[in-house]
Amino acid sequence: MLLSFDRTNFPLIAVEDVGVEAHLLPITKVQFEQFINESGGDKLPYLDMLALNPPVAPDKFTFEEIERLFITGILPDEALAFAGWLGDGFDLPTLTEWRAIYHTFRRAALPIDTPFSPDLLPGPAGLILTRLAAQAHRHSLLDVSLMRSGLVDWVRDNKQWVGLGAPRPEFHPNLWDPLTNTVKPIHAGERIPYFGFRLVRRGEWYLAEKERVRYVG
């Protein structure tokens, strides 16, 4: 498995079927706070998001608190501002890309000794992934990545924004199948507490940034 890392030191995985790298996790509050602090962005929208979904420490969350690690209630334009800060090539995925990532992660099994450890991934990313991998029923990349039983992720469907994902029912009851269903907000500009995002990076950046690439498995 080929991992590269963004400027917040969170991992992306190469998804060859659609020629992108994809964030292994939805974007966390830790990452978004770094963006606000370094870019000097407006903190008020972030406070609105926190009111919908309060934070939890990366090294102390329980199974029932997983969703509190991640940015939710965000709007597509705000997610794109974060993508621009991360650097060239970063973007919200298209519907086709997201579903290809889902299929890729579903095919990938985690080894018994998970490769996601604080030694390999220092900082919050390693803490979060180690605890996620240790949670019950999270023995596949699809589960650890929270593409299953996680959030609804913003994606681009032609000229409109829709959501893909199926949160765990304890967080938000639903019967969605992200491979066949899309989730559409009722009102434009509505902050939805179960909507988050992950990004893709288009282009073979991992070939140009070899110092930020690791093979694990």
List the predicted regions and their residue ranges:
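A short, contiguous structural element within a folded domain that forms the immediate neighborhood
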Residues: 115-141
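Short acidic N-proximal helix/loop "leader" segments that mark the beginning
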Residues: 1-14, 51-53
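Active-site microenvironments of metalloenzymes and redox enzymes
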Residues: 16-114, 204-213, 217
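Extended hydrophobic/Leu-rich segments
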Residues: 5, 66, 105, 121, ...
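A short linear-motif detector with a strong N-terminal bias
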Residues: 1-2, 50-51, 131-132, 174-180
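Surface-exposed recognition segments
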Residues: 136-217
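Short, solvent-exposed secondary-structure boundary motifs
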Residues: 1-6, 61-66, 132-134
